[in-house]
Amino acid sequence: VLHAPRVQVYSRHPAENGKQNFINCYVSGFHPPQIEVELLKNGKKIDNVEMSDLSFSKDWTFYLLVHAAFTPNDSDEYSCRVSHITLSEPKIVKWDPNK
């Protein structure tokens, strides 16, 4: 059974320009477990990301958290790109600092 991933992008703390924070990409509800998750800054892959261990929920779908340190400002755009067998093309979700 195939399940497409849900993707949520959020900062650990309320965003303040010039103040260091962590950006999180939480990917959940997917199956099979093979997945590629990348954090992007202005469309370019962020290299120094940390990834949680792949875990599964009671319904046997998987979830994963990818995060990186970042310092928000008005000019940079952050997003999360997810590739999975259920997606015809990678899913890109932008971070909204006002959420």
From Swiss-Prot:
Primary site of residence: secreted
Residues annotated as domain Ig-like C1-type: 5-93
Pfam families xref list: C1-set (PF07654)
UniProt subcellular location: Secreted
GO annotation, cellular component aspect: extracellular region; MHC class I protein complex
Keywords: Disulfide bond, Immunity, Immunoglobulin domain, MHC I, Secreted
Example GO biological process: antigen processing and presentation of peptide antigen via MHC class I
Disulfide bridges in this chain: 25-80
Record carries keyword Iron: no
General function of this protein: Component of the class I major histocompatibility complex (MHC). Involved in the presentation of peptide antigens to the immune system.
Family: Belongs to the beta-2-microglobulin family.
Record text on subunit structure and interactions: Heterodimer of an alpha chain and a beta chain. Beta-2-microglobulin is the beta-chain of major histocompatibility complex class I molecules.
Protein name as annotated: Beta-2-microglobulin
Lineage: Eukaryota, Metazoa, Chordata, Craniata, Vertebrata
